[in-house]
Amino acid sequence: PYPPPEGTRQARKNRRRRWRARQRQIHSLGERILTTCLGRPTEPVPFLLPPIERLRIDCSEDRGDSDPQGVGDSQIPGKSCDLLGSGTKE
């Protein structure tokens, strides 16, 4: 948690400086773990979006009665699109 705002101005400044240094250390440790143990790059892989013409919000897609051509389908073939989940806690 962020340090509490109490004490003298100098004490608060030092606490914030130490807190930021700790956060940097945690972040770099996380990057090292991702890189060495999981083989993941530290930078996120760019997410490719479909052309803007194919994007749409259509509630009928959930019921399965959308157009048969699949126009507007932004799913990646072979991948399920469960962004919001079922709404129940596990």
Swiss-Prot record:
The gene is rev. HIV-1 lineages are divided in three main groups, M (for Major), O (for Outlier), and N (for New, or Non-M, Non-O). The vast majority of strains found worldwide belong to the group M. Group O seems to be endemic to and largely confined to Cameroon and neighboring countries in West Central Africa, where these viruses represent a small minority of HIV-1 strains. The group N is represented by a limited number of isolates from Cameroonian persons. The group M is further subdivided in 9 clades or subtypes (A to D, F to H, J and K). One of its GO terms (cellular component) is host cell nucleolus. Homomultimer; when bound to the RRE. Multimeric assembly is essential for activity and may involve XPO1. Binds to human KPNB1, XPO1, TNPO1, RANBP5 and IPO7. It is found in: Host nucleus, Host nucleolus; Host cytoplasm. This is Protein Rev. It comes from the Viruses. Phosphorylated by protein kinase CK2. Presence of, and maybe binding to the N-terminus of the regulatory beta subunit of CK2 is necessary for CK2-mediated Rev's phosphorylation. The keyword Protease does not apply. Residues 10-23 have a biased composition (Basic residues). Residues 1-23, 59-90 are annotated as: Disordered. GO terms for biological process: mRNA transport. It comes from Human immunodeficiency virus type 1 group M subtype A (isolate Z321). A motif (Nuclear localization signal and RNA-binding (RRE)) lies at residues 8-24. The modification Phosphoserine is found at S66. GO terms for molecular function: DNA-binding transcription factor activity; RNA binding. The RNA-binding motif binds to the RRE, a 240 bp stem-and-loop structure present in incompletely spliced viral pre-mRNAs. This region also contains the NLS which mediates nuclear localization via KPNB1 binding and, when the N-terminal sequence is present, nucleolar targeting. These overlapping functions prevent Rev bound to RRE from undesirable return to the nucleus. When Rev binds the RRE, the NLS becomes masked while the NES remains accessible. The leucine-rich NES mediates binding to human XPO1. Coiled coil: none annotated. Escorts unspliced or incompletely spliced viral pre-mRNAs (late transcripts) out of the nucleus of infected cells. These pre-mRNAs carry a recognition sequence called Rev responsive element (RRE) located in the env gene, that is not present in fully spliced viral mRNAs (early transcripts). This function is essential since most viral proteins are translated from unspliced or partially spliced pre-mRNAs which cannot exit the nucleus by the pathway used by fully processed cellular mRNAs. Rev itself is translated from a fully spliced mRNA that readily exits the nucleus. Keywords: AIDS, Host cytoplasm, Host nucleus, Host-virus interaction, Methylation, mRNA transport, Phosphoprotein, RNA-binding, Transport. A motif (Nuclear export signal and binding to XPO1) lies at residues 47-58. Gene3D superfamilies: 6.10.140.630.
